[in-house]
Design a protein with these regions (language model features):
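Transmembrane alpha-helical segments that form core, pore/gating elements
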Residues: 7-12, 78-79, 84, 115-171
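Cytoplasmic-side transmembrane-helix entry/capping segments in multi-pass membrane proteins
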Residues: 35-42, 89-101, 120-123, 144-154
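Hydrophobic transmembrane alpha-helices of multi-pass small-molecule transport proteins
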Residues: 8, 89-109, 126, 130, ...
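Juxtamembrane helix-entry segments on the extracytoplasmic side of multipass membrane proteins
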Residues: 1, 31-36, 94, 109-129, ...
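C-terminal transmembrane-helix exit sites in multi-pass transporters
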Residues: 11, 15, 74-95
Length: 181
């Protein structure tokens, strides 16, 4: 929620600056508003799902080194998924992929393939979801205002996270107040 609270005045400041320069980034038509809401929903839901998978994976197996490496696989996965969208890959991409997969093997396969833990799968799914989120932002950002997209995205993450917390945890009002700042 903190990001939402920061982005609201940021949008207002950017709007004021743009008005002075004679431009306006506000969505004017219903179609533009719908596109912004859809972009915020898609990007926000992917970000929420990736963050949730990461947090659950770390809860199951709190090896931060492994979690960091598996999560960082999104750096390799984004260009790989980009290949499916018609983007070209360089030789460096393929070398990086091989090195990353070797590192993944050394980190996760201590006792053969069966040694992959459920937390590893969650953290790999986190990397995939972060990759999709980055690709979604790349897709939508030329179509909508970036600051408004960030606001919509973080609003979706905040709402979905709050709903998940209420469904799967038993937070007290004091905990909400304590974590609000």
């Amino acid at each position: 929620w903190l990001a939402v609270l920061v982005l609201i005045p940021t949008v207002m400041v950017f709007d004021a600056i743009r008005r002075k320069s004679g431009t306006d980034a506000k969505p004017k038509t219903a179609a533009e508003k719908k596109k912004l809401l859809a972009a915020g929903f898609v990007c926000g839901t992917l970000l929420f799902a990736a963050s949730a998978a990461q947090q659950i994976g770390i809860t199951i197996n709190p090896s931060t080194a492994k979690a960091g490496f598996l999560t960082a696989m999104y750096v390799v996965l984004v260009p790989v998924f980009g290949l499916f969208l018609g983007r070209k890959g360089s030789a460096q991409l393929w070398v990086s992929m091989v090195v990353a997969v070797l590192g993944l093997y050394l980190l996760c396969m201590k006792n053969g393939f069966g040694s992959i833990e459920s937390s590893d799968w969650l953290l790999l799914s986190c990397a995939v979801l972060f990759s999709f989120q980055i690709i979604a932002v790349d897709h939508f950002s030329p179509q909508v205002d970036g600051v408004r997209l960030s606001l919509a995205e973080f609003l979706v993450v905040s709402v979905e996270s709050t709903v998940a917390a209420l469904l799967f945890e038993t937070p007290s009002a004091a905990q909400f107040a304590e974590n609000a700042l």
